[in-house]
């Protein structure tokens, strides 16, 4: 359970990195500077920092590819986990559970797993009280 939560947190972090907006170009930065009339030294340093962010485009591409690989593996793990839970919970054969999971969308599978683990965590918490 702990590993699943950590993996989910990593997936969310990679999603944020992969979906972040590309850095602004120098031309756009100059327009922003003119519009805001930046005279303060801190603002100028901030704009220089933004201009240097174009180097991070390569890193963003790397994380984007890594994110896709991790997401694919996470989806496969979620499918297997959903099938196991259905077999255990509903008492049906693995083939039937696999057919049910295949008919579900990825969003439905995630919701199913979150509901299952949420109920399980709530039961454990209530037992401790």
Swiss-Prot record:
Name of encoding gene: cit 1-6
Gene Ontology, cellular component aspect: extracellular region
Function as written in the Swiss-Prot or TrEMBL entry: Insecticidal, cytolytic and antimicrobial peptide. Forms voltage-dependent, ion-permeable channels in membranes. At high concentration causes cell membrane lysis.
Record's subcellular location: Secreted
Stretches assigned to coiled coil: none
GO MF annotation list: toxin activity
Family according to the record: Belongs to the cationic peptide 06 (cytoinsectotoxin) family.
Native organism: Lachesana tarabaevi
Protein name: M-zodatoxin-Lt8i
Expression (tissue specificity): Expressed by the venom gland.
GO BP terms in the entry: defense response to bacterium; killing of cells of another organism
Residue ranges listed under propeptide: 21-60
Signal peptide stretch: 1-20
Pfam families associated with the record: Latarcin
Primary site of residence: secreted
UniProt entry keywords in alphabetical sequence: Antibiotic, Antimicrobial, Cytolysis, Hemolysis, Secreted, Signal, Toxin
């Amino acid at each position: 359970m702990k590993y699943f939560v950590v993996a989910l947190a990593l997936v969310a972090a990679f999603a944020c990195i992969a979906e972040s907006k590309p850095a602004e170009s120098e031309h756009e930065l100059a327009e922003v500077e003119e519009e805001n009339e930046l005279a303060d030294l801190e603002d100028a340093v901030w704009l220089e920092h933004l201009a240097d962010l174009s180097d991070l485009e390569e890193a963003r591409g790397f994380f984007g590819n890594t994110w896709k690989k991790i997401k694919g593996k996470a989806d496969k793990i979620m499918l297997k986990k959903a099938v196991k839970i259905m077999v255990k919970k509903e008492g049906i054969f693995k083939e039937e559970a696999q057919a049910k999971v295949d008919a579900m969308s990825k969003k439905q599978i995630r919701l199913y797993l979150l509901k299952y683990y949420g109920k399980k965590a709530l039961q454990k918490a209530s037992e401790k009280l």
